[in-house]
Amino acid sequence: MKAALLLTALTALPLPAAAEPALTPADTLPATPEGKAWKLAWNDEFNGEKLDETKWDVPEYKRRDSWWSRKAVSLDGKGRLVMSTLKDGDKFLDACVRTRGKLEHAFGYYVARVQLQKQAGHWTAFWLYNDCVGKVGNEGRDGTEIDIFEKPWLDDRVQQTLHWDGYGKEHKSKGFVPKVPGVMDGFHTFSLWWSPEEYVFYVDGKETWRTKDGGVCQAPLYIKISDEIGEWAGDIRKVKLPDEFLVDYVRVYDLIDKK
């Protein structure tokens, strides 16, 4: 069970160091440049009985072969967000939460601790996005979709991808697929260090991919955690539902000057 944590908004004055309770479990943060330190800027530990909608928006609309629905989003009362994939009549429902209009942020260290789905037919993701991704002409500097992870497979592979210059004929992308033994068992952390110069991706605190592809995005993005149904992940009609994707926490750290 995670310790409760008072959220400090990005626009608020920072709390004195002594007033900040410890996070449990603690994150393994990357080593910082000399004279710099990590500072927690935003987080959700998913304590309580229902989703904190001062932090999250819950979209509801058709997405690929299913519908994003509030019916698929809940908390388990044990400090975890539950994102369900289920059948509702003749429709399939799954889940998305996002910080659109609540947290739109550039740079820093983004980390989520999750337990992945058990069934085929749908894929889970932790990603950064904004409408600026649709801009064309300045490569990814004016907007990049950053997929910290996508998981369409039930094996050790993890998809990490960048998309820029919109989604039409000018669309460009670059990705990497590391193998992470045991990733389908228990909880794991997926994270990104996004600096003005490069992206560094991690799984369980270990670097998996370092890249500058597309020209590093300089625009604020918001967080999305989602589940989608489509052929990429297999045939949803052949699996046993409901299935669950659990999120233990999401945290964002800023790199600041040491005092």
For each feature predicted by the language model, list its residue ranges.
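Mature, extracytoplasmic segments of signal peptide-bearing proteins
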Residues: 15-19
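GH16 jelly-roll
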Residues: 20-259
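Bacterial N-terminal signal peptides
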Residues: 4-14
